[in-house]
Design a protein with these regions (language model features):
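Secondary-structure transition motif
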Residues: 1-141
Length: 141
């Protein structure tokens, strides 16, 4: 069973909020889409008063359960390289897949959890679509 982790892109402040800083994901009202994130800028300790921050304009990204060749956790929205090709990680409703960054419709995709050889990952995360938009624009090698 994989770890359930999230990270959040705060659109207003243009910064990534990591899993260890997320205090609460709020689902207010009907539906399956969260509409508020409560987080702290500091590492959370049970002995200190927490300076809570609220985020309403965000993108929530789930951890795939897979790490890259440098043991970096892979999340939705990450950009990775596999066989000299760039991919963006998306969730298709059943599995995490890497979609060819050109999104031409004629592109290639791969299952993130299938990019392993002899128990080690053959992919490397090079950034994400929020903080490294230029990486996608560069295209494939």
């Amino acid at each position: 069973m994989r770890d359930i982790k999230f990270r959040v892109w705060d659109k207003n402040n243009r910064k990534m909020i990591l899993d260890e800083n997320i205090l609460k994901i709020c689902f207010l009202g009907k539906g399956h889409t969260p509409n508020m994130i409560v987080y702290s800028d500091k590492k959370i300790s049970e002995y200190e008063e927490i300076d809570k921050r609220y985020c309403h304009n965000f993108e929530l990204m789930m951890y795939t359960g897979v790490n890259d060749c440098k043991n970096k956790e892979i999340y939705e929205g990450d950009i990775f390289v596999h066989n000299n090709q760039k991919f963006e990680v998306i969730y298709d409703g059943t599995r995490f897949i890497g979609v060819d960054s050109d999104r031409s419709g004629n592109g290639y995709c791969c299952y993130v959890d299938s990019c392993y050889k002899d128990g080690s990952s053959s992919i490397e995360v090079t950034g994400n679509v929020y903080e490294n938009t230029e990486s996608l624009k560069e295209g494939n090698k």
